Design a protein with these regions (language model features):
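Charged, amphipathic alpha-helical segments and their flanking helix caps
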Residues: 1-23, 43-127
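A short, polar/charged loop/turn motif at coil->beta-strand junctions and beta-hairpin connectors
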Residues: 33-36, 54-56
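A short, hydrophobic beta-strand-centered structural micro-motif
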Residues: 35-45
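Short acidic low-complexity segments
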Residues: 25-34
Length: 127
């Protein structure tokens, strides 16, 4: 079975070293039970109509959840990811053309003091 697009983006980011220092999760955030651990969550976020033999856009949401009181580290990771995608929009043939949607969004804080950035990407893919 072909991996889902959020799994392909996770693999692409992992291969490029963008997930280093993060516990990688899929679909939903699961508290690692350790405030010193940063987490990156990959999940699907909709897209355009999927038609046979035509390209479609698949949207992927990547939550970058920083360790407690490590806000600058989380922001640096977010900027590295955005820079990587801008410089390498066709680095992975399984992803197709990837681009960031909405740049870097305003962060939110969790009750525990973790900073969260929700990055969204559009992947144009077709066979």
């Amino acid at each position: 079975m072909t991996p889902l697009m959020h799994e392909r983006v996770r693999n692409m980011f992992g291969d490029a070293g963008q997930t280093t220092g993060f516990a990688v999760q899929q679909l939903m955030y699961d508290d690692p039970g350790d405030l010193s651990k940063a987490v990156m969550v990959f999940r699907p976020s909709g897209g355009t109509a999927i038609r046979t033999d035509l390209g479609s856009e698949y949207y992927v949401l990547v939550d970058v959840v920083g360790a407690k009181d490590k806000r600058k580290d989380a922001l640096s990771a977010v900027q590295r990811i955005v820079d990587y995608v801008q410089a390498n929009p066709m680095a992975d043939e399984c992803v197709g053309y990837i681009q960031n949607m909405g740049a870097i969004p305003a962060p939110v804080l969790t009750e525990e003091g973790r900073i969260v950035f929700r990055l969204q990407f559009a992947c144009t893919y077709g066979e």
